[in-house]
Amino acid sequence: GFDFEYLAQEKGFLVVYLQGYKNFWNDCRGSADYEANLKDVDDIGYYKKVINLIEKDFGINKNNIISTGISNGGHMVYKLAYEIPNSTFLHAPLVANLPIKNNNDCDISEVEVNMAIFNGTNDQINPYNGGLVSLLGNDSRGEVLSSEESYKYWRDLSFFEEENFKILPERDKNLNSSVTKKDVIGSKIVALYTLVNGGHIYASPNVKYSSFFGGNVNDINTAEEIYKIFENLKIKN
């Protein structure tokens, strides 16, 4: 859908797409059978090197980095938040829940971060309510926490006074899908976007997935929602 590219032109930021080893990231799920995990690829080191290279070549402000990724990429975003929390200003994992404790092999810092999670209630790969992650019969990725538990983990690391909840405007005229947002705005912003009847997808009016992925949600533009949080953080800080 090129949402990030269009938004970058409008807002004046740089979009960078990192490529994982053989199309996978070495995330926190210790049991996963893809080679990035089996070979313990140093994706944290890779991320740091890319940031330094971009700073050198483009003069970016390293204090304004947003990191987002979908599915395995979302799990890599969690790893960044766990292991190098201060290297990213805003973390935005898509269709990914935290792994359960006994399958989490990340070095967990328990440092508060800005976090925005986008998960679909009809996701058959990353189950919204937690459980076994299964893709085409491959169960090696193990079990994950629920979306609510994943959100609460990051929420409870921050200091906040109240939690907000709202139903976002209906924009695609499809009453079978909708989006709710729960968040806290305290020492950090932590948010959970629930894509009601959405599947293993990136939510946007500009993107359409096949039925295999569990259902489209067109009421929000995910890139725009992430950038709104970024703008609110810059005002807040």
Model feature map: region roles:
Residues 123-126, 200-202:
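Acidic catalytic loop of the alpha/beta-hydrolase fold
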Residues 37-45, 71, 82, 141-145, ...:
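Soluble non-cytosolic domains of exported or imported proteins
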